Structures are given as structure tokens and as C-alpha cells.
Amino acid sequence: MPSDPGPEAGSGWPGLLMSCLKGPHVILKMEAMKIVHPEKFPELPAAPCFPPAPRPTPTLAPKRAWPSDTEIIVNQACGGDMPALEGAPHTPPLPRRPRKGSSELGFPRVAPEDEVIVNQYVIRPGPSASAASSAAAGEPLECPTCGHSYNVTQRRPRVLSCLHSVCEQCLQILYESCPKYKFISCPTCRRETVLFTDYGLAALAVNTSILSRLPPEALTAPSGGQWGAEPEGSCYQTFRQYCGAACTCHVRNPLSACSIM
């Protein structure tokens, strides 16, 4: 006969009591969750993200084609007529450098205010009689080139740009010596007088101050005609550069009757 087995583990009253106390087995399903620390990811906002507040758009001033009355353009402001701005510091203007005179620049001659330059000669206003006589007294009555005395027919004195006078016959020879460049070299100072017009030597003024001091016999035409004993000295031959085709004077008329001269 088999022997009676002893009480099994968990069996008997103690095991029954323990099984009653344990109750039914409950299975709970746990989900895995990962905890992220914010200091490892600074781009993740810790607080709830809200859109930024809209900023007011600045209003742009309309462009002006012309500056206003109170606006100063430095490069265009000149003189002492600039309006003073309120609150702007006033700085004294820089001292201007004195301009060099004509003598310092190599031009010793200072033209007077009432001097008028007409073509190649200078016309000065008529001074008093004493001043005019003293100024004209220093001018010679003879041509510096040929040495002949001036007269009103063939040897009228004409003024060059250097204010020296030469008779018309000598000027004709000097003018024909360089017809290409149309300039005359003064026989006294060697300065050149350029003729810019088509009138030739007629563009040079007659020195009336010398004519007023000539003797009476130099103011009349010779007895043998306008040219005296010089048959080759006709109006067209000698003074063709002055009159040209428009000359209206003839052999018996004085040269002053020419409409161009």
C-alpha cells in the first residue's frame, strides 16, 4: 500500500489561504516614454510658441525733385546768403587766398576800365586837350621802317596791335611777305599782329593823333595828282589789299574817299 505523501508545497490550508489572498492576476500594459531634457536642445522652445507681434512699417517721405527752402546744398551754397539753421554750429568761413595780380602772373600791363579793343587796335576815350597833346607829342611823325614822313595819301599811319604805327606802304610790303598766315611783324618791337578779317590792312585803324600834328602840306594831295610822279602807285596796284573790287576811288580823288577805308 502506498504511503501517504506529505503535504505538497503550496497545497493544503496554507496554500489555499495564500491563493485566496493573492486574488486574480492583473496584466498592465506599459508604454515606453522617452524623457528629453530641454538643455540638450536649446532650439526647442520651453514655452508655448506664439507668432511675433507685427511691427509698424515706417512711412517713407516722398521724394522731392527740388530742395525745400530750409535745405542747404553745400556744393551749391555760395556767398553769405545761406540761411542759418537753428541749432547748427556756426563756423567762420576760411580766409580766401588773395588773387595774384597781372604783374605777378607775367602780365605787367593793366588795361584801364574804359579801354575798348576794336579788332586789332585800341581806342581810348578822349582825355583833356593838354593830356592828349602831351601823349601825342611822343609819337614820331616819320615811319620807323622807311623813315618817310606820314601824309594823308600814300603814307597814312596805321596802328598795330602793339600800338606802334607804320605807314601804309610799308605795311603793304610786310603783309605781302607772308600772305599764307596773314600776320604782320612790327618793325619796332617784333610783335605780330594777326588780321582776322577779310578787309586786310583796312582792318587796322588810322592813327588820327599823328595826322592832326602833320604840317599843312602833308594834308593835301600832290599837284601832279593823287600819287604825284609815281604812275605805278594807282589805287588798285598799291592798295588792292585795302579796297579790292569794292574800291570806288579814282586817280583824281583822295584816298579817303574809299567807302571801305
From Swiss-Prot:
Any one Gene Ontology molecular-function term assigned to this protein's record: zinc ion binding
Q: Check the record and name the SUPFAM superfamilies matching this protein.
A: RING/U-box
What highest taxon heads this organism's lineage? Eukaryota
Organism equals Homo sapiens
Q: Which cysteines are joined by disulfide bonds?
A: none
Modified-residue entries (Phosphoserine), positions: 102
- Write down the InterPro entries for this protein, in alphabetical order: RING_finger_E3_ubiq-ligases (IPR051435), RNF208_RING-HC (IPR040100), Znf_RING (IPR001841), Znf_RING/FYVE/PHD (IPR013083), Znf_RING_CS (IPR017907)
Q: Give the gene name.
A: RNF208
Question: In its UniProt entry, what is this protein called?
Answer: RING finger protein 208
**Keywords for this entry?**
Metal-binding, Phosphoprotein, Zinc, Zinc-finger
Q: Where is this region: Disordered?
A: 83-106
Annotated GO biological process: protein autoubiquitination; protein ubiquitination
Q: Which GO terms describe its cellular component?
A: cytosol; nucleoplasm
Q: Could you say which residue ranges form the zinc fingers (RING-type)?
A: 143-190
